[in-house]
């Protein structure tokens, strides 16, 4: 499942946490799966002054209901020591200071980063059960397209492409 993109089915419309969510599964361990909600931008952002005249401002997204006091990064650039590869040209990590250093040094463009507060998590068999119960739809998309789902209205656009069953949503 690592690297898969999930879209919440209309069966989850009453679940306010995952309502109209698009999630990228970023990690799978023996304990479970970790995902980040791609299309839930908040009204918050992180800023940092770098150098004497440059201020970096990165939008903050709601990654999910777990560990909301931690930040996670999704980026299209690799820095082998501080990130975990998800798939082709897509990495995740959690070192904000290193990220700002990379931006300051011109090694990463802030447009190539999504910053999340919290993450979504499932026990090892839990997500498979939820998919089997039609709570989630696994998209057959390339993960390098993950940045295309950043807008809040992405769910509406995608659900209409999934066939007659979902067109009314």
Predicted ranges, named:
Residues 1-116, 120-169:
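A short aromatic-anchored loop/beta-hairpin motif
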């Amino acid at each position: 499942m690592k690297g898969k993109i999930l879209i919440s089915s209309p069966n989850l419309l009453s679940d306010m946490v995952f309502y109209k969510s698009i999630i990228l599964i970023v990690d799978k361990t023996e304990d479970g799966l970790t995902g980040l909600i791609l299309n839930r931008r908040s009204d918050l952002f992180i800023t940092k002054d770098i150098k004497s005249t440059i201020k970096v401002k990165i939008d903050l997204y709601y990654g999910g209901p777990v560990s909301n006091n931690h930040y996670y990064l999704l980026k299209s650039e690799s820095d082998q020591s501080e990130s975990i590869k998800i798939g082709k040209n897509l990495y995740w990590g959690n070192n904000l200071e290193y990220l700002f250093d990379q931006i300051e040094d011109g090694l990463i463009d802030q447009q190539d980063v999504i910053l999340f507060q919290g993450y979504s998590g499932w026990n090892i068999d839990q997500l498979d059960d939820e998919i089997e119960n039609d709570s989630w739809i696994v998209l057959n998309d390339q993960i390098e397209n993950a940045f295309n789902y950043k807008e809040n209205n992405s769910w509406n656009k995608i659900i209409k492409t999934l066939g007659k069953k979902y067109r009314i949503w």
